[in-house]
Amino acid sequence: MATKVYIVYYSMYGHVEKLAQEIRKGAASVDGVEAILWQVPETLQEDVLSKMSAPPKSDAPIITPNELAEADGFIFGFPTRFGMMAAQFKAFLDATGGLWRTQQLAGKPAGIFYSTGSQGGGQETTALTAITQLVHHGMIFVPIGYTFGAGMFEMENVKGGSPYGAGTFAGDGSRQPTELELGQAFHQGKYIAAISKKLKGPAAA
């Protein structure tokens, strides 16, 4: 049976979604892994999103809390809001009380990726505060550390991401993830998928 890795994300302007798509490619490159993209539900009304000039959502399916139980590993992605995950993703996690009660996510590996508006805009604080959500579910946080190699030490150009996970800077919204940031995202997907497969054990395809 294939190891299921869910890439679950919230993206308002598409920056996190671009990272998510690359992460899925990386996870799917691991033999025996089924990598699936999911969006969490939007909490803002359409008229509000329109006033914020938010583009239409992609066709990635909307996940429900109970569907998390079907996965063997996770990579969660979200934009930063004042140094923490966006409220839309927090609202989704707040609805996982039933899974917490039955401990259906305990022992499962999970990684984190993110987007901020600027350097120093909360990439590491967003990751740090998100870890508390994993801890209460008994999940295993899987950082990428410095496994991305030389790409972690890029100094000539602006680059998002950290040992906590892949990331990008959106700026005023016009900046898009760079090739290096997308490369780190692909690496994260591949890295966490391989660990998820290993933790699942011999039952994995």
Swiss-Prot record:
Residues of the Flavodoxin-like domain: 5-192
Top-level EC class as recorded in UniProt: oxidoreductase
GO cellular component, one term: plasmodesma
UniProt cofactor note: Binds 1 FMN per monomer.
Subcellular location, record wording: Cell membrane
Family assignment from sequence similarity: Belongs to the WrbA family.
Protein name: Probable NAD(P)H dehydrogenase (quinone) FQR1-like 1
Phylogenetic placement of the source organism: Eukaryota, Viridiplantae, Streptophyta, Embryophyta, Tracheophyta
